[in-house]
């Protein structure tokens, strides 16, 4: 049994939008996601745009065209909604590439009905990962022309209804897909959520470390600017130094003729001031040559690119961790169903065996077989409790008295 899967999330900044753009359009040089098969990337396609887009520019264009609200849009307003539509591998394994494209065309049709065709930014299908899926983006503009991600996305109840409508939409197109159950209904294991949170926390810490490096560079730059300004102030200080011409006697030991020696005599204090201004001039001259040559701009540009790459990789790791967790969660649903079927069959077999052997013989035999395996003994007891609840309700008080005893942890005779 396969499921229809649709998820949606708010994108809170232009930087995050750029990270999504690079992931969706495969613009990065390297990817942390090992599921990407680069030899198949050419099979990816977008059902909205013929060419690659700058998502932030496209969002601004959509808002300019479709926003009719009277209020000025806040700088921290959410302008981008990102989502994903897919199913499981069992579904796509039975689809040709043309069938798969038709499925996503129907999915795009649903998005246009929900959000409005003019508000759809992209609908990009990735065929180069383990499971085909479609990333979609929307500008959250309401029917009356306001920008409101809160109203367009809604709360958990609204999201549940959104998922219901999508499942009904694909069913009407002939796909026998069940609705993907929410985590609250399926009671996903706490361990899985903890692992996901650990991965997310790791990338968050990595991003914070890179931010600290950036702050350190900024502090260093501020310090250099202060030193530069100090040198500039020294250089601008007017020079007004009293001085004397050095003289010497000429014409022999007893001669009175005096002439200038060609040197100027100044005080030690004034000499030190000269030295400061000379050093300031040298420092500024070196900085000027560094800037004039273009090396300063090149170095700063390189530094910004490196930091931008690190930030994009951190964003991509978080997105991939989120995608991998959701895919793992959805793939586990069929396994859960199979386990439930197996348990149901086991109950039927045990009930029949109990009928053939009789209650006492059956219970003694099971307890004997599992007495050295506490977990198996406990499992057998739980199954028997579900099969014969009336026996346990009658002996509830007795169970409470014996619950800490080592023996009699299995079935009741």
Curated annotation (Swiss-Prot):
The keyword tRNA processing does not apply. InterPro entries: Mob_Pre. Residues 188-198, 403-413 have a biased composition (Basic and acidic residues). Keywords: DNA-binding, Plasmid. GO terms for molecular function: DNA binding. DNA binds at residues 45, 115. Signal peptide: none annotated. One of its GO terms (biological process) is DNA recombination. It comes from the Bacteria. Residues 175-198, 374-413 are annotated as: Disordered. Belongs to the plasmid mobilization pre family. Contains conserved positively charged amino acids probably involved in the binding of the pre protein to the RSA site. The interaction of the RSA site and the PRE protein may not only serves a function in plasmid maintenance, but may also contributes to the distribution of small antibiotic resistance plasmids among Gram-positive bacteria. This is Plasmid recombination enzyme type 3. It comes from Staphylococcus aureus. The gene is pre.
